[in-house]
Structures are given as C-alpha cells and as structure tokens.
C-alpha cells in the first residue's frame, strides 16, 4: 500500500516536471527579443567596470503600477551636495526585460545644483528598473524599483 | 508648428537653481515593431541631447529606444549670469534640431 502510494507520487511529480518544461519552452520562443539578466549585468558592467555598486543615495521615482507601458514617467534624484568637490557625474538607467537593457545615460556636473533628472520611458513588460549614479569620487550607487505594466510597449503592430 | 518646447524661467536671481524642461516632437521608432506584412520598421530615434549655457555644456543625455515618443527631459542648473541656453537633439536618419532660450539674471 505504502509502496504504491510512493510510485503514484513519483509519477505525478514526473508528469508535473515535464509539463513545467513544456510550459517554459513556448515562453522562450514567444519573446526572443527580451533582454536577459546577463545582458543587463553586461550593460551595467560596461558603465561601472569592476567598481562596486552600492545601494543607497539614489531615489528612483516611478509608478509601481502603470496601465500603459508606452509612456511611464520616471524621476531619478541623487542625494548629493553638488559642490565642486562632491557632485554627481552621471546617472544611468537600466531595465530588465525590454529588448535592450539600456534606457538612458544622463551626464551632469557640479553646476547642475540639484542631481535630478526626469523623463518618460517605455516598458515592454512588468519588470525591475535600476538607476545607477556615478559620483565625483567614482563610487557607484543604485536604486531599483519594481513596475507592473498592464499594457506593454513595443508589442503592437505598426500601421 | 515648432517641434521643440522649452520651459526656462525668463528671470532668476544669481545663484538660483532653476529647472529646465524640454520636449522634442519625435516618433522614437524602436526598431522592434513589425508591419502587418511582417517587415521590421527600421529604428528612428533621437540618440543624443545636449544643453549648453553660453557655450559650455551643462547637461547631456544618451537616449535609447526605451525613451518614450516625444522625448521629455527635465534637469536643473545653477544660474550665475545672464545668457543663452542652447539645446541640440541628434538622431537617426540625419535628424538634427536646435532650440534656444535666454535668461536674465539679476
């Protein structure tokens, strides 16, 4: 009795496992043009090199839930005195699942006065958005936000 | 119809931090969309934006297809003297537009 129960469970797990594999394959085929986490980390490495990226100082303002991924307002601000000795050199914004990992690079200087940039971006899917700031002492700081998108950008047909 | 909209305060006090808002009308075609017949719509985006004040660069941005159509950018600068802001957008297919705005500093 106990032996037959064990077999049944194993069979069930086997079937469930194959179903999961079968389920995963079409997802990969449907979205060939999606940036992978490897592309994201490569894009980040491209900017920061071997430097350590720490969490903090950066504030990424983006709605947690957006209806239309074609235009998502986004503001990045960095806590910095913006003096000649201590300022933000640049702000870089990345995403996880758009066809390309980059969103934009913004270059500031000490005379910006306030390290804050706003724009409107496109998001192809619900995903994480990461902002990285490079300070004048060449340290990197980051912030990440999760965004849920109900209508994705990039997927509709052009007329 | 002007293709650029710029918002810069006309007057400011010396040392003020002012906000600059810019909007350029552009389709920002990503290059990832297809027509009904399956052809890829070629990429056509603005790739670079620069703002100069009296000739010196104060802000620059590299744009990617993930920037929404009609790129809208806001940023800040400290004003020390009266002068002219010059804005430049450069993109695919030889796209190049400029705009300018003046500010009086008291």
Question: What do these predicted regions represent?
Answer:
Chain B
Residues 91-99:
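Short acidic/polar inter-strand loop motif in beta-rich domains
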Residues 71-75:
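Short strand-edge motifs at loop-to-beta-strand transitions and within beta-strands
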Residues 1-2:
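Proline/serine/threonine-rich low-complexity linkers at boundaries of modular beta-sandwich domains
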Residues 17, 80-84:
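Extracellular Ig-like/FN3 beta-sandwich strand-entry sites
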Residues 102-106:
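Short beta-strand edge segments in extracellular beta-sheet folds
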Residues 5-10, 14-63, 68:
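Contiguous segments within soluble domain cores/interaction surfaces
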């Amino acid at each position: 009795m106990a032996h037959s129960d064990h077999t049944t469970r194993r069979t069930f797990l086997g079937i469930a496992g194959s179903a999961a594999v079968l389920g995963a394959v079409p997802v990969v085929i449907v979205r060939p043009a999606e940036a992978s986490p490897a592309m994201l980390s490569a894009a980040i490495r491209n900017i920061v090199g071997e430097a350590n990226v720490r969490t903090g100082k950066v504030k990424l303002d983006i709605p947690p839930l957006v209806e239309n991924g074609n235009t998502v307002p986004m503001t990045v601000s960095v806590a910095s005195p913006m003096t000649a000795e201590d300022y933000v050199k640049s702000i870089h914004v990345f995403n996880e699942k758009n066809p390309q990992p980059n969103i934009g690079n913004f270059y500031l200087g000490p005379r910006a006065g306030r390290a804050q940039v706003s724009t409107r971006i496109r998001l192809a899917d619900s995903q994480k958005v990461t902002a990285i700031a490079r300070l004048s002492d060449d340290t990197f700081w980051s912030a990440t936000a999760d965004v849920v998108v109900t209508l994705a950008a990039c997927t509709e047909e052009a007329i | 119809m002007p293709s650029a909209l710029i918002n810069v305060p006309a007057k400011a006090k010396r040392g003020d931090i002012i906000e600059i808002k810019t909007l350029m009308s552009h389709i920002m075609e990503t290059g990832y969309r297809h027509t009904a017949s399956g052809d890829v719509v070629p990429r056509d985006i603005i790739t670079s934006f620069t703002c100069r004040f009296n000739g010196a660069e104060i802000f620059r941005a590299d744009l990617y297809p993930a920037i929404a159509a009609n790129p809208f950018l806001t940023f800040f600068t400290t004003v020390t003297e009266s002068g002219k802001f010059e804005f430049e957008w450069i993109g695919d297919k030889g796209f190049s537009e400029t705009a300018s705005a003046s500010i009086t500093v008291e």
